[in-house]
Amino acid sequence: MSTISVLITALALSMDAMSLSIYQGIASTESQKKQNFLKIVLTFGIFQFAMALVGSLSGILFIHYISLYSKYVSFAIFLFLGLMMLKEALKKEEMEYDEKYLDFKTLIIMGIATSLDALLVGLTFSILPFYQTFLYTVEIGVITAIIAGLGFILGDKFGNILGQKSHFLGAALLIFISINILL
């Protein structure tokens, strides 16, 4: 696999993380932006790297089981997050960002939900020498972190421009992605 192929793969893998990052950029208050930006970038970058590496190390032993359920788990999580965001957007009063929303448990769930596909991609690396696998998985993690950061910034800008309507946009985006996962 060439470096260009890994770059394109990493960009494709990072789209789920970008979607959630956009939402976090929209939802975060001014006082939470820097902290949430770091949480998002690190969580998505580390999880994409780690899951791709775990996938490559586990080889073909578990590919059947992982491939059976990964899209359904991702669908359920994205749909749940989208519906939760839609429910909040439908409230009449101005929404307040819940600082507990990005607690450790939530970050873990989001990290897993966005990196199940990286686990499967990692399985394709299992035939490569370890040093090459490691470099490719690091590349995937770094690119995902960058894309997640850009998504957060984009969400922040949209949130400032659109106000509360941006929550409808974020909800629609998450629900669309959940449906797209099943197709």
Swiss-Prot record:
GO cellular component terms attached to this protein's record: plasma membrane
GO MF annotation terms: manganese ion transmembrane transporter activity
One Pfam family matching this protein: Mntp
InterPro entries registered for this protein in UniProt: Mntp/YtaF, Put_MntP
GO aspect biological process, one term: manganese ion export across plasma membrane
Keyword Cell inner membrane among record annotations: yes
Keywords: Cell inner membrane, Cell membrane, Ion transport, Manganese, Membrane, Transmembrane, Transmembrane helix, Transport
Protein's membrane topology: Multi-pass membrane protein
Listed transmembrane segments: 3-23, 43-63, 66-86, 107-127, 134-154, 161-181
Domain of life: Bacteria
Protein localization: Cell inner membrane
Family: Belongs to the MntP (TC 9.B.29) family.
Protein's job: Probably functions as a manganese efflux pump.
Protein name listed in UniProt: Putative manganese efflux pump MntP
Gene this chain is encoded by: mntP
